[in-house]
C-alpha cells in the first residue's frame, strides 16, 4: 500500500484580531445577560471598524444590561487602549440595535409551546464534533500549536516581554504527516501588529525566541523548518482599523482548524438553545469520549436537527477506518449513552452559565478548563462496557 505523506496546515488568530474582537464582545454580552437571566434568548452580532462598534441582534430577556459598558470593558481587556491604534475603548462609538426574538421561533424552542411540547432545536442545521489522538487533549496538532502561539503572543505583549507588540496577530502551523501521523513541523507563520518605530530584525528575533521556540517542541523542528515572521515586513495598521471585524467569521479557527467537517454555524453571541453552539459542543464531547475510550483513533460525529423538534433527525459517525468496532454500532452506542435533545445537552454540559467570553478566543475545543464541560472524558467506562472492549 502506498505510504501517505502530506503537509496539513491550520491557523489561529489572537484576541486582538478584529473578527475575534467581535466574537468576544458578542459573548461578553451573552455572559452579562445569562448572569441575570438563564432563560434569555440571545443572538448578538457585533461589527467593529475604525473607531466604532455596532451591536445588533435579537435578544429576549428580563436582564438589564449596560451594553456600551460591556463593549468598552471587553475592548479594554483585549488591549485597544490608544486611539493611535485606530481603536480605543474609551473613545470608540458604540451603536446598539437590539430586537426581540421572533415569536414564531420562540414557540418552537420554548417548552410547552408549539407543535411539539418538548424544548425543540432553535433552528434546523447540521453540526460536527471531532477528536483524534494526535495530542493529549485529543485535538489535531496543527490547530493546538496555532492556538498556543497566538496565546503566547498575547502573553508576551501583556507582560511587557515584547512591549512593541500590539493586539492584532495571526499564526499558522504546517505539519508533515506520514501515514496520518504528525512527524515534523514544516512551516510556522506569524504576523503580529507592532509599534511603528521597532525594527523588523527586533520583531523577528523577539517572536522566534520568546514565542516560537517556547511553544514548538525542539524534536518537531529540523534544519528545514521555516519561520515566516511578519512576511510583508511591516504590520503597524491592524485591528478594527486595518480590517472590519464581524462575529462568526472565524468558525474554523474556533473548531478544528480544517480537520473534519463543519456545518457552517458560528458559536459566539448565541445562547445554548441555538444548536449551532450547544450541539457542536455536544459533538465534541461525544467524539472525545469515543477516542478516549479507545473505540477509534479518530472520530467525526455529525448530528442534525429540525427547528422545533427535540430529537436529532440524524446521527452519523466516521472513524476514518480506525474503529475497533463497526461504525454502525458506534452510532448506536452514541444514542444509548448520550442524550442529544437540546434541553438534555444544556443540562448535561451545564450550559446556562456565563462561561462564553472565555471560549471566544483561542478555540472552543481542546482547552481543558473547568468551565469547558464538553472536554470531560467521563463516559469512557460505559462506552467500553457497551462496546465490549
UniProtKB/Swiss-Prot annotation:
Pathway: Amino-acid biosynthesis; S-adenosyl-L-methionine biosynthesis; S-adenosyl-L-methionine from L-methionine: step 1/1
Keyword Nucleotide-binding among UniProt keywords: yes
Named cofactor requirement(s): Mg(2+); K(+)
Binding site for ATP: 17, 168-170, 234-235, 243, 249-250, 266, 270
Intracellular or extracellular location(s): Cytoplasm
Binding site for Mg(2+): 19
Source species, domain of life: Bacteria
Residues that bind L-methionine: 58, 101, 243, 274
GO molecular function: ATP binding; magnesium ion binding; methionine adenosyltransferase activity
GO biological process terms held by the UniProt record: one-carbon metabolic process; S-adenosylmethionine biosynthetic process
Pfam hit, one: S-AdoMet_synt_N
Record organism: Geobacter sulfurreducens (strain ATCC 51573 / DSM 12127 / PCA)
Protein name: S-adenosylmethionine synthase
Major subcellular location class: cytoplasm
Keywords from the named record: ATP-binding, Cytoplasm, Magnesium, Metal-binding, Nucleotide-binding, One-carbon metabolism, Potassium, Transferase
Residues at which K(+) binds: 45
Entry-linked CDD domains: S-AdoMet_synt (cd18079)
InterPro entries cross-referenced by the UniProt entry: ADOMET_SYNTHASE_CS, S-AdoMet_synt_C, S-AdoMet_synt_central, S-AdoMet_synt_N, S-AdoMet_synthetase, S-AdoMet_synthetase_sfam
Its biological purpose: Catalyzes the formation of S-adenosylmethionine (AdoMet) from methionine and ATP. The overall synthetic reaction is composed of two sequential steps, AdoMet formation and the subsequent tripolyphosphate hydrolysis which occurs prior to release of AdoMet from the enzyme.
Subunit field text: Homotetramer; dimer of dimers.
EC number: 2.5.1.6
PANTHER family: S-ADENOSYLMETHIONINE SYNTHETASE
HAMAP family cross-referenced by the UniProt entry: S_AdoMet_synth1
